[in-house]
Amino acid sequence: MGSTSSLYAAIDLGSNSFHMLVVREVAGSIQTLTRIKRKVRLAAGLNSENALSNEAMERGWQCLRLFAERLQDIPPSQIRVVATATLRLAVNAGDFIANAQEILGCPVQVISGEEEARLIYQGVAHTTGGADQRLVVDIGGASTELVTGTGAQTTSLFSLSMGCVTWLERYFADRNLGQENFDAAEKAAREVLRPVADELRYHGWKVCVGASGTVQALQEIMMAQGMDERITLEKLQQLKQRAIHCGRLEELEIDGLTLERALVFPSGLAILIAIFTELNIQCMTLAGGALREGLVYGMLHLAVEQDIRSRTLRNIQRRFMIDIDQAQRVAKVAANFFDQVEKEWHLEAISRDLLISACQLHEIGLSVDFKQAPQHAAYLVRNLDLPGFTPAQKKLLATLLLNQTNPVDLSSLHQQNAVPPRVAEQLCRLLRLAIIFASRRRDDLVPEMTLQANHELLTLTLPQGWLTQHPLGKEIIAQESQWQSYVHWPLEVH
């Protein structure tokens, strides 16, 4: 029987869903063991006097009986159960909580909106990569949290009384997806936002991160439809028009939208459009974690790392016994190549980061077998938990590793949506060349090289006589030129 003392559980009694997260602490980071989510729709059980109906409470207790079974193996000091907006509001919350505590065998804490916002921010800070200065948006069932911060520190926290369940009951009660219902829902959301908008804008942000079911649903829709993963106002408006075209909630069909998420999708969409409009948000990406992750990391007292992606890469290198010196060597060559062609190819900083990340993991497939190592690498990266990387970025890394050597599978580079297809091709070319020139596994054997780009033509200049002195290297480069030419990537080597 394994020790249970490294297990931690976080339970979030939300207004729309109840969630449970069980993790194990491994070398200063967390490994997810269980995630259970049940749609309880507690907020829908509030009447005009803010009393919870017996049916809604029973739905909640039924869900907690499922959770209780899993909690039996975990020390009570390593369990945190929090309740949010609906139980802050309900006049008979005490009745619900008393029974909930009896079922779970541990305390249930009703947290304030500000504390909820702080925990959400901590969950994002521990699990989401990108710029340090961020705005975090979480649309819950009955409240919406908006938080600005830098690194681990919050600079402003707001919890607003609007959510996808309450807005559904208020503005889409007739289940009609007409323009007038959307207009009313957006107008009301903007009025709720207006008093806090100035302070949020004053603190500012470099990156905006969404941490809710609505944003998760948008991500799933965009992945299913082959769009890039950045959420923009234009995409939100397109989805709204699609919803209006469907006419009624029970007839809402959007490629990638699950039945489970469909009910509260239009109301969440209206709130998100209002947030984008009122705060002039350019684009948003999906967070790696939120409230439950904030609770877990709080219990573990782990510091927020400056660079979550680096922590993730280090942990994976250790776990799969990757040769770190070689990974760094390849990364150094790739970075040098990238810096030489960046201007001509109009590449962005995030592309450089993703190329370096691919270099750090490029030999992960060897931990399975040398034979088909690129396929093993792609499979592992696609299926590993990579905090700090978005789902689309994971897919790009897997695709680059699949194409690190041998003939190029162009269609796979075009199927990812983290970067435009042309950029994926360019990063792939740089990775392949870096692996070749670092293959001797010694810093002093990496030649001084210049790489020039002229549209798609790459010209690589090596030291005089290098090709003559390195017949195997010459053969490998000739083979690489041929493979690149098959997919119309011209490569000249001098």
UniProtKB/Swiss-Prot annotation:
Top enzyme category: hydrolase
Q: In its keyword annotation, does this UniProt entry include Zinc-finger?
A: no
UniProt entry keywords in alphabetical sequence: Hydrolase
Which InterPro entries did the record assign?
A: ATPase_NBD (IPR043129), GppA/Ppx_hydrolase (IPR050273), Guo-5TP_3DP_PyrP (IPR023709), Ppx_GppA_C (IPR048950), Ppx_GppA_N (IPR003695), PyroPPase_GppA_Ppx (IPR030673)
Quote the SUPFAM superfamilies the UniProt record gives.
Actin-like ATPase domain, HD-domain/PDEase-like
Q: What is its EC number?
A: 3.6.1.40
Q: In which pathway does it act?
A: Purine metabolism; ppGpp biosynthesis; ppGpp from GTP: step 2/2
Entry's Pfam families?
Answer: Ppx-GppA (PF02541), Ppx-GppA_III (PF21447)
Quick check: keyword Cell membrane in the entry? no
Q: A single GO molecular function, which one?
A: guanosine-5'-triphosphate,3'-diphosphate diphosphatase activity
The record lists the catalysed reaction(s) as: guanosine 3'-diphosphate 5'-triphosphate + H2O = guanosine 3',5'-bis(diphosphate) + phosphate + H(+)
Q: Which GO terms describe its biological process?
A: guanosine pentaphosphate catabolic process; guanosine tetraphosphate biosynthetic process; nucleobase-containing small molecule interconversion
Instruction: Provide the function of this protein.
Output: Catalyzes the conversion of pppGpp to ppGpp. Guanosine pentaphosphate (pppGpp) is a cytoplasmic signaling molecule which together with ppGpp controls the 'stringent response', an adaptive process that allows bacteria to respond to amino acid starvation, resulting in the coordinated regulation of numerous cellular activities.
As for family, the record states: Belongs to the GppA/Ppx family. GppA subfamily.
Q: What is this protein called?
A: Guanosine-5'-triphosphate,3'-diphosphate pyrophosphatase
Organism lineage = Bacteria, Pseudomonadati, Pseudomonadota, Gammaproteobacteria, Enterobacterales
Name of the gene encoding the protein in the UniProt record: gppA
